[in-house]
């Protein structure tokens, strides 16, 4: 018996990619985080951050939670806030999809949009606006996925354990997109302890500095890559970064939908493109896992639309 929706977070399935990776010698698998109740990997950390704050006495029902997010953490927090009785304000850049905003509002949270081009320390950025609101609203708290150690700890203890349960030590490479860095830091550290020689690969959009390079510019893929290094991100865990552009990200995502039947989001295309590149070095019988962070629900008017792709010179 499941007594509330938060108990369904985690234990997401792993499936073999039979079409898109058929040219590779190795086996390629995908962990489908869209099966979480809010639709993404961020449900994991949203629940964990709320749970940690409750156990420490930092927050109590009726308080206001505030978070700067690209959307999926906002949905996860809105889910938790709805179940547990918190007010929630999500501060999100304008670039992020309308579907994310509508989902967050449906769960009862408030949305504030900020300029996409505003850099991390700009007074108009979603980070700065969240801090300003926190200083003005009594009994408000920023859980702060960018600095909260519950983020990588959750992936170290739970996500990585699920991977070990599925593969044991028979896994040679894991590929993930990098946003806050929580998933790759937590999963990477745990798997490197348990599986000697495993390669941890990060997917990073052109325009982000996380995977190298100092040229910061806008891009369409949501939820990965930034113009600053989050405090919780331990880049030493990453063996290699693969830089990915919007065109390759979205074309790969569309292929995953059409050829594999996986209704995934745009950054899943970036991670899979990186996996297909990195896994060229693997041999027959070796195994590569790519973590696909969310589903297509948040992007129904974006990359799956031919018109949107044409408007943005991507096809």
For each feature predicted by the language model, list its residue ranges.
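PLP-dependent amino-acid enzyme catalytic core
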Residues: 1-315
